[in-house]
Swiss-Prot record:
Residues 266-298 are annotated as: 3 X 2 AA repeats of F-G. Its main location: nucleus. PANTHER family: RAN BINDING PROTEIN, RAN-BINDING PROTEIN 3B-RELATED. The modification Phosphothreonine is found at residue 455. It holds the Pfam family Ran_BP1. It comes from Arabidopsis thaliana (Mouse-ear cress). This is Nuclear pore complex protein NUP50B.
Length: 465
């Protein structure tokens, strides 16, 4: 606890033990370790000490006046071997066998071109060496750069020998230097592909260049064989894409005529008047056929209602007008309203349908009246009952009314059925009651009069109503 009382609080800042000022800068302290500075004690070291020391003299030169502009030391580095540019079309056309005298002259021209190219290469290598010495990047980088550039020059001289007639000698020195530095792997592959395609188009029937003559002769024989096969019309199983030039269809060997008959086809059908397999057309095509028919399904599909021989069209017989009788032709509707009909069965009300309810009055002498109701949509008959004098109507709720009648459409064919009608508005119920009371005294038919008119046993009681 005592230490904590003597401890300096954290909020107090650290201060100097002595106050320094301009008059007392702190140099006149009485410390034992310090001693006054003595003047005149700095002397030159002895010769023995100087002999043991290593004196290094630094020479500074002005690089701004003598040094050339900085260049990229990695400009001459190439990761792929150099190849000569693609030969011109004129050189490709003159690739025919030459006589012995012409070959000797050509060899002399090539040797001269090689010498001139070597001279240019040496001058370029000297310039590159001079630039590499001036660089401060290190001796190792300049040595590697020189080796890589020398290798590229040798490859370039070998490639020049394969050029026809010394065509590359006529190029300028700047073009050769630029091509040597900027050549990449993609250019090499492109040159090889162009050479292969040009040899294939020409048929490979001549010997080109001094080196690889046997291989070129072999390719010429293969090209002649392929041309004979295509002229004879022989259809192979699957032809190689390499054997066809860009102007030919690569799919020619798949189905004899390929896609020449139509743009899209399934199967082959002989053309009219043809005997061989060379003129065939598609039986199912989306393009134009050879014989001029533009049928969607080819010339084989000839089923049509119209025949070409008779040029007559078979028309379907027209349907006869049939009169539809509903049985209401000699009747007049005294009441019409939309309602929902229910029937009392097995101690409960079951819905029988929704539709238009009519009270029809016959226009004949008997003036018979009946109830007719048909469902909406299909006009199915759901109620057909004649009115009788003893018919009683009972009110249900505010919008409904119930009664007993003989419904010819009901499942219970013998006796009366207890029905109920529900309308949208109470006023419609009163109107319906008035129409029934007015026309129920009409005389029913003989069959309906003979039926016993009594309350059915399954009729609901007054409490249920």
């Amino acid at each position: 606890m005592g230490d904590s009382d003597n401890a300096i609080p954290f909020s107090r800042k650290r201060t100097a033990l002595k106050e320094l000022s301009r008059d007392n800068p702190g140099l006149d302290d009485d410390d034992e370790d310090t001693s006054a500075l003595e003047s005149g004690t700095f002397n030159t070291a002895s010769k023995e000490v100087l002999a043991s020391r290593r004196i290094i003299r630094v020479r500074r030169t002005d690089r701004s006046a003598t040094a050339p502009p900085a260049s990229n030391p990695f400009t001459g580095i190439r990761l792929v071997p150099f190849t000569a540019p693609a030969p011109s079309t004129a050189a490709a056309e003159t690739t025919k066998p030459l006589s012995a005298g012409k070959q000797e002259t050509l060899a002399d021209g090539r040797s001269d071109a090689t010498k001139e190219t070597d001279g240019d290469s040496k001058e370029k290598s000297d310039a590159i060496d001079a630039v590499g010495k001036q660089e401060t990047q290190g001796d190792e980088i300049s040595a590697k750069t020189k080796d890589i550039i020398d290798g590229g020059e040798k490859e370039m001289s070998e490639a020049v020998n394969s050029v026809e007639g010394g065509g590359a000698v006529n190029k300028n020195e700047d073009e050769i230097k630029t091509t040597m530095v900027t050549e990449v792997a993609a250019g090499e592959e492109t040159v090889k592909d162009d050479n292969n395609n040009s040899n294939t188009v020409e048929g490979s029937d001549c010997v080109v260049k001094d080196t690889g003559g046997n291989q070129t002769e072999k390719e010429g024989k293969e090209g002649d064989g392929n041309e004979d096969t295509e002229k004879n019309g022989d259809s192979g199983a699957l032809s190689s894409f390499h054997q066809h030039s860009s102007s030919k269809n690569a799919f020619t060997g798949l189905a004899s005529t390929g896609f020449s008959a139509s743009s899209f086809s399934f199967g082959l059908v002989p053309q009219e008047g043809s005997t061989g397999s060379g003129s065939e057309q598609s039986s199912f095509s989306f393009g134009q056929a050879n014989n001029g028919n533009s049928s969607l399904f080819g010339a084989s599909v000839a089923t049509s209602i119209t025949t070409k021989s008779t040029e007559t069209t078979t028309a379907f017989p027209s349907k006869q007008d049939v009169s539809v009788e509903t049985g209401e032709e000699n009747e007049k509707a005294a009441f019409t309203a939309d309602s929902v009909m229910f029937e009392y069965l097995e101690g409960g009300w079951k819905e029988r349908g929704k539709g238009e309810l009519k009270v029809n009055i016959s226009t004949t002498e008997n003036r018979k009246a009946r109830l007719v109701m048909r469902s909406k949509g299909n006009y199915r008959l759901t109620l057909n009952a004649s009115l009788y004098p003893e018919m009683k109507l009972a009110k249900m709720d505010k919008k409904g009314i119930t009664f007993a009648c003989v419904n010819s459409v009901s499942d219970a064919k013998d006796g009366l059925s207890t029905l109920a009608l529900k309308f949208k508005d109470p006023t419609v119920v009163e109107e319906f009651r008035a129409v029934i009371e007015e026309h129920k005294d009409s005389k029913p038919s003989v069959a309906e009069a003979a039926a016993p008119l009594k309350t059915p046993e399954n009729s609901p009681s007054a409490e249920d109503a």
